[in-house]
């Protein structure tokens, strides 16, 4: 496979000796236009990789915050087609920030895998994280995606033991997303020293960068995780920043893009200090 | 979609990947994958272990009350004036439905795996009650997820579960019905991977659940085969069963799938009619998609978002169906038809008066189809219907629809 934006980014960050800040937001939350403004604000505020959430009615691996964000987006009329269009629109002024679409398989299956991959490629999508497609189901989307030149980023979890890791890593590309705990998105962050051990274990099996997510909410957590990982993923905290500026009627009480940008600037400072702090300790 | 070539046998599925044709599979988060593989390994060992079989049989006989009778419904047959109608009386099982067959099998499996905590999802509460029952019997803590809407409309079953020592957790996410309860149970499982066994209530979900639930329920069809041969000296012409997730139907059908002369009809909840969204007829009015770990027929919109179903019967109120039914539909082996709420209600009342049996609203759907078909069949023909549950739980809902006070 030719190098992708994701590969180029990690090469650059390696030279800078700092981890990536990976930010998740829900496409279409609370509506298309607001959500696009959030997306555009992310790299400006210091995000290195954007995870573009595709809303799904039944997000079995997500906690209450992301569930609610997905329902808001669907209520606001978001569809997979619109999420792709959002990426395309973002690409008009940004050609370097990698976009990874994250969600569940059914909307893609219904859209049609081939049609989806063609559109995704045309919209400047770099990678996919599909929660309910384990390696056992690789023929569904992973293999066609790789053929289409789109990275398929796999989740590795604390239950993925050394015996299973090679299978999980086999068709993974771009980076490995290590889920720091067993559980749903937005739960409490576990002991960061455990996370460092897990990252080391995965690195023993792959040369790919390892990003860590699930539970990272603050700049200090981002700094601590970023000392060991190649990237830090923040999702629920960003989704909450949007929810916090929505009134009971769903109308915004402040600019959601600015609320998200403020949070992301803090997180970006956190990851930039990660290795410096680690070296000083 | 191309129709698969008719197989030599309809009873060999699923394949090693857990597929029935294009249906089934293992569409789950990576966190759950090792657990599902572990379950498969233990299941493969258990199903070939005579001691496991013997323990299950023993419990079936002395705890559940198996075999359940095959009853010739003489007055109903006379009333309909056509085929002879037999009922497989699963409603006489301990806990009042076929659900206990699966729960006993799975709790033995959980014990074998060394799991110490049981979780389950429930809609009407029948599976919740059966899970709470077997958890009490084996001394394991049990958490039952139930949509908040269902908690409200199924109060007696909620109380039963609590009496049995289970913790009932109302689910407010989504729309608070069975599919949300299943999402929440999966979220619990993904969090508590070490000690927890997820006791799924129907023949759906990721492989190996559809297979193992079917096998635990197949006792229904196996007994039926022996009983009808004893009573009539031949196999029936038709089997009829209600399908929600489809476990009672697959349990009755599976042992007969290769008996060519036996026609089979699965009856879905047509709700208030298939024109709008107020039904649960995923096979008749849905399309293939991926939800809750398997590919199967679903009620969904053009964006692949899952719809809420509607049925008068909370037990059929699920927008999906077990994957083996999807396969049997496409293979043309089983016919699936919808029955409306009002037809089920009429059938419920008819059976109550004619045979002195109060059926659950789920098999009342199957009964409504029998009422349509039997008169058109010859008097020498035989229908066996799965009377999968008793209707005590439904008297409040029925009273409401009949505008009566309880």
Curated annotation (Swiss-Prot), chain B:
Tetramer of two alpha and two beta chains. Its cofactor is pyridoxal 5'-phosphate. It comes from the Bacteria. It holds the Pfam family PALP. Keywords: Amino-acid biosynthesis, Aromatic amino acid biosynthesis, Lyase, Pyridoxal phosphate, Tryptophan biosynthesis. Its EC number is 4.2.1.20. GO terms for cellular component: cytoplasm. InterPro entries: Trp_synth_b_CS, Trp_synth_beta, Trp_synth_beta/beta-like, TrpB-like_PALP, TrpB-like_PALP_sf. The modification N6-(pyridoxal phosphate)lysine is found at residue 99. It comes from Chelativorans sp. (strain BNC1). It catalyses: (1S,2R)-1-C-(indol-3-yl)glycerol 3-phosphate + L-serine = D-glyceraldehyde 3-phosphate + L-tryptophan + H2O. GO terms for molecular function: tryptophan synthase activity. The keyword Metal-binding does not apply. The keyword Amino-acid biosynthesis applies. SUPFAM superfamilies: Tryptophan synthase beta subunit-like PLP-dependent enzymes. Pathway: Amino-acid biosynthesis; L-tryptophan biosynthesis; L-tryptophan from chorismate: step 5/5. This is Tryptophan synthase beta chain. Belongs to the TrpB family.
């Amino acid at each position: 496979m030719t190098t992708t934006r994701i590969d180029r980014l990690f090469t650059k960050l390696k030279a800078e000796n700092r981890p990536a800040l990976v930010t998740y937001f829900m496409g279409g939350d609370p509506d298309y236009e607001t959500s696009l403004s959030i997306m555009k604000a992310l790299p400006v505020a210091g995000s290195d990789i954007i995870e573009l959430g595709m809303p799904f009615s039944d997000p079995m691996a997500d906690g209450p915050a992301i569930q609610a964000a997905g329902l808001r987006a669907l209520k606001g009329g978001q569809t997979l087609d619109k999420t792709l269009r959002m990426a395309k629109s973002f690409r008009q002024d940004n050609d370097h920030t990698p976009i990874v679409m994250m969600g569940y398989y059914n909307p893609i299956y219904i859209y049609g895998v081939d049609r989806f991959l063609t559109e995704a490629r045309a919209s400047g999508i770099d990678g996919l994280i599909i929660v309910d497609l384990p390696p056992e189901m690789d023929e569904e989307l992973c293999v066609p995606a790789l053929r289409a030149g789109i990275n398929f980023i796999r989740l590795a979890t604390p239950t993925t033991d050394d015996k299973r890791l090679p299978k999980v890593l086999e068709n993974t590309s771009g980076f490995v997303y290590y889920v720091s705990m067993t559980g749903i998105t937005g739960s409490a962050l576990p002991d960061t020293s455990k996370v460092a051990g897990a990252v080391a274990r995965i690195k023993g099996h792959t040369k790919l960068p390892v990003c860590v997510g699930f539970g990272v909410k603050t700049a200090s957590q981002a700094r601590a995780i970023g000392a060991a990982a190649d990237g830090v993923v923040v999702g629920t905290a960003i989704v909450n920043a949007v929810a916090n500026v929505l009134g009971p009627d769903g109308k915004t009480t402040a600019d959601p893009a600015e609320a998200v940008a403020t949070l992301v600037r803090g997180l970006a400072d956190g990851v930039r200090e990660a290795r410096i702090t680690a070296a000083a300790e | 979609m191309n129709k698969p070539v008719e197989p030599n046998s309809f009873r060999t599925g699923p394949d090693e990947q857990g597929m029935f044709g294009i249906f089934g599979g293992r569409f789950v988060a990576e966190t759950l994958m090792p657990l599902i593989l572990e379950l498969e390994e233990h299941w493969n060992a258990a199903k070939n272990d005579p001691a496991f079989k013997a323990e299950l049989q023993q419990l079936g006989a002395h705890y559940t009350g198996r075999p359940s009778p095959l009853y010739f419904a003489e007055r109903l047959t006379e009333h309909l004036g056509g085929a002879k109608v037999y009922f497989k009386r699963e409603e006489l099982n301990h806990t009042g439905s076929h659900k206990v067959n699966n729960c006993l099998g799975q709790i033995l499996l959980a014990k074998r795996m060394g799991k110490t905590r049981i979780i389950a999802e429930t809609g009407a509460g029948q599976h919740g009650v059966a899970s709470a029952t077997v958890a009490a019997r084996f001394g394991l803590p049990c958490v039952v997820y139930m949509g908040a809407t269902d908690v409200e409309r199924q109060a007696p079953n909620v109380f039963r579960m609590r009496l049995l020592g289970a913790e009932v957790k109302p689910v407010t996410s989504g729309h608070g019905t069975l599919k949300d309860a299943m999402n929440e149970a999966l979220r619990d499982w993904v969090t508590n991977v070490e000690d927890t066994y997820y006791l799924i209530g129907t023949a759906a979900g990721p492989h190996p659940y559809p297979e193992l639930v079917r096998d635990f329920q197949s006792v229904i069809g196996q007994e039926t085969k022996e009983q009808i041969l004893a009573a009539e000296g031949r196999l029936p012409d038709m089997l009829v069963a209600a399908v929600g997730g489809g476990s009672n139907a697959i349990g009755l059908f599976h042992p007969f799938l290769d008996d060519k002369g036996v026609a089979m009809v699965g009856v879905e909840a047509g709700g208030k009619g298939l024109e709008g969204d107020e039904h649960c007829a995923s096979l008749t009015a849905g399309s293939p998609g991926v939800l809750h770990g398997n590919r199967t027929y679903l009620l969904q919109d053009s964006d692949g978002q899952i719809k809420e179903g509607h049925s008068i019967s909370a037990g059929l109120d699920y927008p999906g169906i077990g994957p083996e039914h999807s396969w049997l539909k496409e293979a043309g082996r089983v016919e699936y038809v919808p029955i409306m709420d009002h037809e089920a209600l009429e059938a419920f009342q008819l059976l109550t008066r004619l045979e002195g049996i109060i059926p659950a609203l789920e098999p009342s759907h199957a009964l409504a189809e029998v009422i349509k078909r039997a008169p058109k069949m010859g008097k020498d023909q035989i229908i066996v219907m799965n009377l999968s549950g008793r209707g005590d739980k439904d008297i409040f809902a029925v009273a409401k629809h009949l505008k009566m006070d309880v």
